[in-house]
Amino acid sequence: MFIELILGIGVGLVSTALAARLSDTSAAAFSLAHHVFAMLFILFRVVGAGVGVVVAQCLGGGRRDAADAVARAALGASTWMGLLTALPALLAAPALMQALNAPAQVLPLAAPFLQALAPAMVLDAWNASMSTVLRTHLRTREALAVVVAMHAVHLGGALLLMPSMGLQGYAL
C-alpha cells in the first residue's frame, strides 16, 4: 500500500508538470482539483485497510466463504462510497472550488476539471478495496502490477490528449 501511495504522489507530480506545460493557470487548476481527489484517495485507502483487516481475519480463521462475502460487500460499499463522493464533485464543483478559495482566473478551469474527474472517484474506490482484497489473498505483485499499468496508461493518454484537450484530456 505504501508503494501505491508513493506511486500516486509521483504521478500527481508528473501530472502537475504536464498541466504546467499548458499554462500556470492550468497548473493551479489541476493542483486545486487534484487536492480534492487526493484527499478522497487517502479516505478510500483507509477504508480499504479496514476491509483488509476483516478479510485477513476471515482467511486466517479458515472461513473462505466469509472472506468472499466481505470482498463482495466491500465492492458494494465502495460503489456507494465512490458515488457519494462523485456526486458532490459533479454537481457542486464550483462551490467546492470556491470553498477552497480558488482564484477567479483558476475557477473556470478547476471546476470543470473536478467534474470530469468525478467518475474516476468511483473507479478509485473500487481500486482501493479490490487491491486490498488481492493483497490479503497474498497477490501483492498482481495488485501492484495493476496499479502500475493503470498509471502508465493514464500518463500515456495524458501526454497525448492534454496538448489538444487541456485538463479535460488528463481526466479522460
Task: Say what each PLM segment does.
Residues 1, 55-122, 153-172:
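Short alpha-helical transmembrane segments in multi-pass integral membrane proteins
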Residues 1-53, 57, 117-124:
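Transmembrane helix-bundle signature of multi-pass secondary active exporters and lipid flippases
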Residues 5-13, 86-90, 151:
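Recurrent gating helices in multi-pass secondary carriers
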Residues 13, 18, 22, 36, ...:
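Short alpha-helical scaffold segments that flank and stabilize functional sites
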Residues 16, 52-53, 94, 128-131, ...:
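Interfacial helix-capping/hinge residues at the ends of transmembrane alpha-helices
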Residues 18-19, 96, 134, 161:
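Broad structural signal for hydrophobic residues in well-ordered alpha-helices, predominantly aliphatic
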Residues 29-87, 127-143:
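Small-residue-rich hydrophobic transmembrane alpha-helices
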Residues 48, 116-135, 143-154, 171-172:
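Short runs within selected transmembrane alpha-helices of multi-pass transporters and secretion channels
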